[in-house]
Regions:
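Solvent-exposed, amphipathic alpha-helical segments
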Residues: 44-48
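Enriched for short, Lys/Arg-rich terminal
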Residues: 1-16, 24-43, 56, 62, ...
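Glycine-rich, flexible loop/turn motifs
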Residues: 49, 58
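Generic structural signal for secondary-structure transition and capping sites
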Residues: 50-53, 67
Length: 98
């Protein structure tokens, strides 16, 4: 899955979405336990692909873990964690609080 968004210079940046095994397992968990949370996770994924640094879920850089790592609030307890690269966004987890 690829999406593009505009940067400050107006140039479109395309990034590929890469879903790591832990993220896929977390998403399966939410489908079984609470489908509303699973749908919210997918909505957040779409928002991240549009703009990884702004939008729903209160994006927050995780500067102490790794450069380019961000989180967004899925529920009060759980976060989606993703890593933004030049040409891809790795979705790492969708459960727990980093």
């Amino acid at each position: 899955m690829e999406r593009s968004h505009k940067t400050e210079g107006g140039k479109a940046v395309r990034r590929e979405a890469v879903f790591q095994p832990e993220f896929r397992e977390d998403l399966r968990h939410w489908v079984e336990i609470d489908r509303k949370i699973a749908l919210r996770a997918l909505t957040i994924v779409e928002a991240v692909l549009r703009d990884p640094f702004a939008g729903i879920g209160k994006p927050k850089p995780l500067k102490y873990l790794a450069p380019g790592m961000w989180s967004r609030r899925l529920t009060q307890e759980h976060r989606i964690v993703y890593l933004v690269g030049d040409d891809r966004i790795d979705f790492l987890q969708a459960r727990y609080h980093y």
